[in-house]
Structures are given as structure tokens and as C-alpha cells.
A protein has these predicted regions:
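Extended, charge-rich helix/loop segments that form flexible
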Residues: 158-181
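Hydrophobic membrane-insertion alpha-helices, especially the h-region
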Residues: 20-41
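Acidic/glycine-enriched edge-of-secondary-structure segments
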Residues: 38-50, 94-102
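Membrane-embedded segments
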Residues: 73, 77-162
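N-terminal Lys/Arg-rich, disordered targeting/topogenic segments
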Residues: 1-19
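Residue-level preference for short coil/turn positions at secondary-structure junctions
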Residues: 66-67, 120
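Alpha-helical transmembrane signal-anchor/signal-peptide segments
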Residues: 41-61, 66
Length: 181
């Protein structure tokens, strides 16, 4: 009889322990989701505020705000070798250089498609080299992750070119902004 009460007592303890474990796991996972969502919403709010600062601001401006008649697109070669003022003086139209160091064909095609969706520039100067088509970087879209949910061209390119596990990770807002922070 003593053995029997021990067995029934251990089942009760086991059920309570399993319930406690389940509740703890649920609370931890819920906390992670809430923190991820809160940080993501904060970063979504902050990104347009820095649209005039640094490389991240330049990318945001390129995707959403640029509206000059002449747009210069490319990687670091276009970024450093095209002087916007000289292009404006020789063509007689305002120009903006959206080229960014380390951003090659896949990145630039998202930028150009976003620009063409908003308006039709009179001239797009697109600097490409052979090595830009076969970029050696592991992830050509890392600078575009923050725009995964908000830009249809970025979303389509990431889903088309990257493995499924990479864009599955982009469901996390913190992961999207990891390249920016």
C-alpha cells in the first residue's frame, strides 16, 4: 500500500512539473515574440527618420524618395567615379547617385525597379562590370533586409534568389534589422 501511494503521488508531481514546464516555455516564447515585434516596430519607425544619414539612409532614400530626372546606379565603382555635379552640369538635369559600396546587380535591380514603380526618370546610368553579375558576397540582399516586408521588389528578389531558410528567418523583425544596427 505504501508503494501504491508513492506511485500515485509521483504521477501528480510529474503532471505539475510538466504543466509548470509547459507554462514556462509558453511565457518565454511569448516574451521573445513580443520583444521581437516591439523592436521591429521601433526600427520601422526609426528607419525613415534616418533617411538622410549614411549608407542605410541612402538605401531608404533610393527605394522610396529619390525623384530626380537622372539616377546613377551601381556598386562602389559608380559610387566613387560618377561625380553628381559634373553629370548635372554636362546633361543639364538634376541627378542623384544611388550607388552603394558592396551592392551589386541583385541589390541594384531592386532599387531600379522601386524607382521605376514610383516615376520614370529621363535617364538611368547603370554601371555594371562582369564581376557585378556574379558577385562574390554570400548574401547580396543583406542591406535590403529591413525592407523585406515593405518593398515588393525586395521581397520577390529575396524569395527568388535566397534559400528558403534565409527568408524564413526574415519573419523575425530583429533579424531584418541586424544588418543596420
Amino acid at each position: 500500500m505504501v508503494v501504491h501511494s508513492f506511485i500515485s503521488n509521483s504521477k501528480t508531481v510529474m503532471k505539475k512539473g510538466l504543466l509548470r514546464f509547459g507554462v514556462t516555455v509558453f511565457v518565454v516564447l511569448t516574451s521573445i515574440v513580443v520583444i521581437d515585434f516591439a523592436v521591429g516596430k521601433t526600427m520601422d519607425w526609426m528607419l525613415p527618420q534616418i533617411s538622410n544619414q549614411g549608407a542605410t539612409g541612402k538605401t531608404y532614400f533610393s527605394l522610396y524618395d529619390v525623384n530626380t530626372p537622372v539616377v546613377i546606379v551601381g556598386s562602389s565603382r559608380a559610387s566613387h567615379h560618377y561625380v553628381t555635379q559634373q553629370v548635372e552640369d554636362s546633361i543639364g538635369l538634376p541627378a542623384y547617385n544611388v550607388a552603394r559600396d558592396g551592392c551589386f546587380f541583385s541589390h541594384n535591380s531592386c532599387v531600379v525597379n522601386s524607382i521605376i514603380d514610383r516615376y520614370s526618370p529621363k535617364l538611368i546610368i547603370w554601371e555594371n562590370c562582369c564581376e557585378d553579375l556574379y558577385e562574390g558576397v554570400d548574401d547580396p540582399f543583406v542591406n535590403l533586409y529591413p525592407y523585406y516586408d515593405t518593398n515588393k521588389w525586395v521581397t520577390a528578389a529575396i524569395k527568388e534568389e535566397l534559400p528558403w531558410n534565409e527568408y524564413a528567418r526574415l519573419n523575425s523583425k530583429i533579424y531584418q534589422y541586424n544588418s543596420v544596427i
